[in-house]
């Protein structure tokens, strides 16, 4: 039985029926209807009229009341929006079910911005929602208020949303691209009206809204998620009383997921016993933070296709704002749960025509878009297309699994829809880029996603508005990072697109430190974005949180996650750890059994275990030599049409992957066909030579030996060919006179630079540079008095003794004189 609110695989990208607009008991079908009956529309308009009639704009003393919107105009606009919604609903009705419809409620509301008036101490509602700052003559673009508050009345409750501009959304190099007469037109910057915040008085609430042309976005408390957007876009952002539609759905109880984590493991999901690791721990003095705990930055570029541009009234400004609104929502999800900020570096809009074929086949679109992405000049960790197309596919997005940081595989294609729905779809496809799998229903009990009405983001049930990753998804991301993936995510932006603002978590011009809204640095070290007197740093793995001083050079700040990674050490002059680098492709690893490739140690054993579980292993060499040369289903180097391609003897270890101890189903991907069990009696024992075609969503068959896997002495696989490592034409690091890379005192990184052992320096690591003080000085306790203090004390003591002696002598001499001249004081002789 499906949980309430779940739908069949595909997330819903359009609106749903209004509870208040039912056609009466017994008159409407239980499920979605092809189109709403006219009485339902009229009832919605009647519900809207009282709100419009009673709306008023707070005015200063003596100001005239503004005229209310004409109800006929508003009703006409509302009916037009609903008609469009009906058409879309009819097209997508197959993606819905009755339980979801009953779990969603909608209302019309008139939100207002809270402002202060002269001689007033409290906020008052103001029905102009625009957040542009006044007096902007010195700016060449609209600048929005750093903070704003909005009041929304809906579902019998009043919500006050306190917002702060999300200045971490756009990079300092953010650019917008569109086309005119076949040429690319670039514009730096753009309007930034994207906010994060909370519901006033509600603990652990979250808000992500944009204020360009009305309110677009979501907010949530412990019970419900609310989506809001204007009924219609307008060019007059100063208009009053703009009706918005607000939708309410049940929210999950995510906090419970992180409690009572299961420690039961299984062969199929060997990572589950490690879930206890996900518990939050109190910060100790300079804890050793792993790659998951460290904040990461995914630099994203969005491309909008031509139909998306047409949908937004052929306005590239509106289209760009839509993309930024979606990424603002995604950023709020990722930073909260994955310790990853999603930073928008560019938005490209195809204003004249599509630059690839837009088809209903997402696999073909993904391959075509990957080729297009390689022509894009802008730097990005991932590039994703938003297309107004309906895929003939079980999901609404597709991306390359684990492809982030790759110019070829760091891409995805996503269906267009309402902002919240597109945000979920984009969250899913980006998660695939980050090595997070889809979760079939069979995994749900182990992953303990207990959303009360649906499920978590990566569930295959197609929940429409989930904002939570399950603990399995979080663990898979951690495992992806631990295997060496995502090395490009650790370059922290140094400045923002918007003007300097204290409190946004980025150190900008005029600031010495910035703790951010979620305090991430040590409070004693940073006050009002200035370092405390005597402090050198305020945050980072290389900042001592008690002394506020840099850790000494050679202090380990980021552990190597595997034998192909490079341990990073503090430099002694920064609080931040150096960039996350790994060894150059071709280094040996795993006791010379594997080769490093893209930061991972590639062996056939590792690949078999990743696909089939911890008990699996690579088959004997005899299996590869015998089967892969035959060119059959049991062994081959690929397929040409209907013909299996035999491997040459030179390439047998780069063909079909043959393993032992396969499980019934793979840990990743889907079986294409069946497992092909094969065994031989060889050298007095039976050897297992089984294989299978395991296909990912992006059509990649991981049933073949991976690129980078060793296939002979100083040789590795590439495109199912066994090649000399020297033939890969990789940039080399400096060699010394003996031919040793980095003088034998360092390793060559993926950037073709020498990373020296911390007692050596120079571009070739040939300069000895011993660490003078590798460990911080130990506290020796209270020190004794200095020699100067002893001398001063001795002198003072001597003077005091002399004074006492002289004083006593004088007193005694005086008494003697008295006894000598006073006859009455004389005693007998």
Curated annotation (Swiss-Prot):
Q: Quote the function comment for this protein.
A: May play a role in cell-cell and cell-matrix interactions. This is a non-catalytic metalloprotease-like protein.
Q: Does the keyword Transmembrane apply?
A: yes
Q: Which residues lie on this side of the membrane: Cytoplasmic?
A: 811-829
Q: Which residues form the EGF-like domain?
A: 729-766
Question: Where does the chain cross the membrane?
Answer: 790-810
Localisation per UniProt entry: Cell membrane
Residues forming the propeptide are: 56-283
A single GO CC term for this protein reads:
presynaptic membrane
State the CDD domains in the record.
ZnMc_adamalysin_II_like
Instruction: List keywords of the entry alphabetically.
Output: Cell adhesion, Cell membrane, Cleavage on pair of basic residues, Disulfide bond, EGF-like domain, Glycoprotein, Membrane, Secreted, Signal, Transmembrane, Transmembrane helix
Question: Chief localization class?
Answer: membrane
Which membrane topology describes this protein?
A: Single-pass type I membrane protein
Its recorded name reads Disintegrin and metalloproteinase domain-containing protein 23
The Disintegrin domain is annotated at 499-585
- Summarize subunit and interaction data from the UniProt record for this chain: Can bind to LGI1 and LGI4.
- Provide the membrane-side ranges marked Extracellular in the record: 284-789
What is the top-level taxon of the source organism? Eukaryota
**Database matches in InterPro entries:** ADAM_Cys-rich, Disintegrin_dom, Disintegrin_dom_sf, EGF-like_dom, EGF_extracell, MetalloPept_cat_dom_sf, Peptidase_M12B, Peptidase_M12B_N
All disulfide bonds of the chain are 405-488, 447-472, 449-456, 557-577, 733-748, 742-754, 756-765
**One of the GO BP terms on file:** cell adhesion
Instruction: Give every Peptidase M12B domain span.
Output: 296-493
MF annotations from Gene Ontology: metalloendopeptidase activity
Tell me the classification of the organism that encodes this protein: Eukaryota, Metazoa, Chordata, Craniata, Vertebrata
């Amino acid at each position: 039985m499906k949980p309430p609110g779940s739908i069949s695989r595909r997330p819903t990208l359009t609106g749903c029926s209004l509870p208040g607009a039912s056609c009466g008991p017994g008159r409407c079908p239980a499920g979605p209807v092809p189109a709403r009956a006219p009485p339902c529309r009229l009832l919605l308009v009647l519900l809207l009229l009282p709100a419009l009639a009673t709306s008023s704009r707070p005015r200063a003393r003596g100001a005239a009341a503004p005229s209310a919107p004409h109800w006929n105009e508003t009703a006409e606009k509302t009916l037009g929006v609903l008609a469009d919604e009906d058409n879309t609903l009819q097209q997508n009705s197959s993606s819905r079910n009755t339980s979801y419809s009953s779990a969603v409620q909608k209302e019309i509301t008139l939100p207002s911005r809270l402002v202060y008036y002269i001689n007033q101490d409290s906020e008052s509602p103001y029905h102009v929602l625009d957040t542009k700052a006044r007096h902007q003559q010195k700016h060449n673009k609209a600048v929005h208020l750093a903070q704003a508050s909005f009041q929304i009345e809906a579902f019998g409750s009043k919500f006050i949303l306190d917002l702060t501009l999300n200045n971490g959304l756009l990079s300092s190099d953010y650019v917008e691209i569109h086309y005119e007469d076949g040429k690319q037109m670039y514009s730096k910057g753009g309007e930034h009206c994207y906010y994060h915040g909370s519901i006033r008085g509600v603990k652990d609430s979250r808000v992500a809204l944009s204020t360009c042309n009305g309110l677009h976005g979501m907010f949530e408390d412990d019970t419900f998620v609310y989506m809001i957007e204007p009924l219609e876009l307008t060019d007059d952002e100063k208009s009053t009383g703009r009706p918005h539609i607000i939708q309410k759905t049940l929210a999950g109880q995510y906090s419970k997921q992180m409690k009572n984590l299961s420690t039961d493991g299984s062969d199929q999901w060997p990572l589950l016993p490690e879930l206890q690791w996900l518990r939050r721990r109190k910060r100790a003095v300079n804890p050793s933070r792993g790659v998951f705990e460290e904040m990461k930055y995914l630099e994203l570029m969005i491309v909008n296709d031509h139909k998306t541009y047409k949908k937004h009234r052929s306005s590239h400004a509106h289209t760009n704002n839509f993309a930024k609104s979606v990424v603002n929502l995604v950023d709020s999800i990722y930073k909260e749960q994955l310790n990853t900020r999603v930073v928008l570096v560019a938005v490209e809009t195809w204003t004249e025509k599509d630059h690839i074929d837009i088809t209903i086949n997402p696999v073909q679109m993904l391959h075509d878009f990957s080729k297009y992405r390689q022509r894009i000049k802008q730097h990005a960790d991932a590039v994703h297309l938003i297309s107004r197309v309906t895929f003939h596919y079980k999901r609404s997005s597709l991306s390359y699994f684990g492809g982030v940081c790759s110019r070829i595989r760091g891409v995805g294609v996503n269906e267009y829809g309402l902002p919240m729905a597109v945000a979920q779809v984009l969250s899913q496809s980006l998660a695939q880029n980050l090595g997070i799998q889809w979760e079939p229903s069979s995994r749900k009990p182990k992953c303990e996603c207990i959303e009360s009405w649906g499920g978590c983001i990566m569930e295959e049930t197609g929940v429409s508005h989930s904002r939570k990753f399950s603990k399995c998804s979080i663990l898979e991301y951690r495992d992806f990072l631990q295997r060496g993936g995502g090395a490009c995510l650790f370059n922290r932006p140094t400045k923002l697109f918007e003007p300097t603002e204290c409190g946004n978590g980025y150190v900008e011009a005029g600031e010495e430190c910035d703790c951010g809204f979620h305090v991430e640095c040590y409070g004693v070290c940073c006050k009002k974005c200035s370092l405390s007197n005597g402090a050198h740093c305020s945050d980072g793995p290389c900042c001592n949180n008690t002394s506020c001083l840099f850790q000494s050079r050679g202090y380990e700040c980021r552990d190597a996650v595997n034998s192909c990674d490079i341990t990073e050490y503090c430099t002694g002059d920064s609080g931040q750890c150096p960039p996350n680098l790994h060894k150059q492709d071709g280094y040996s690893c795993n006791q010379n059994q594997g080769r490093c490739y893209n930061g991972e140690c590639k062996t056939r054993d590792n690949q078999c275990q990743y696909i089939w579980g911890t008990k699996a292993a690579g088959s004997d060499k005899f299996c590869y030599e015998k089967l892969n040369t035959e060119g059959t289903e049991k062994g081959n180097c690929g397929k040409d049409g209907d013909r299996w391609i035999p491997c040459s003897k030179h390439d047998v270890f780069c063909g079909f992957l043959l393993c032992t101890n396969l499980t019934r189903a793979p840990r990743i991907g889907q079986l294409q066909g069946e497992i092909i069990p094969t065994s031989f009696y060889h050298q007095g024992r039976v050897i297992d030579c089984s294989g299978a075609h395991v296909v990912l969503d992006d059509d990649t068959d991981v049933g073949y030996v991976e690129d980078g896997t060793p296939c002979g002495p100083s040789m590795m696989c590439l495109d199912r060919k066994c090649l000399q490592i020297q033939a890969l034409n990789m940039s080399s690091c400096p060699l010394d006179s003996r031919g040793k890379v980095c003088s034998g005192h360092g390793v060559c990184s993926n950037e073709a630079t020498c990373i020296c052992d911390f007692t050596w320096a120079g571009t070739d690591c040939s300069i000895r540079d011993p660490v003078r003080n590798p460990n911080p000085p130990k506290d020796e306790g209270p020190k004794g008095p200095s020699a100067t203090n002893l001398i001063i004390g001795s002198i003072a003591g001597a003077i005091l003794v002399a004074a006492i002696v002289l004083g006593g002598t004088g007193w005694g001499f005086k008494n003697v004189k008295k006894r000598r001249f006073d006859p009455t004081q004389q005693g007998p002789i």
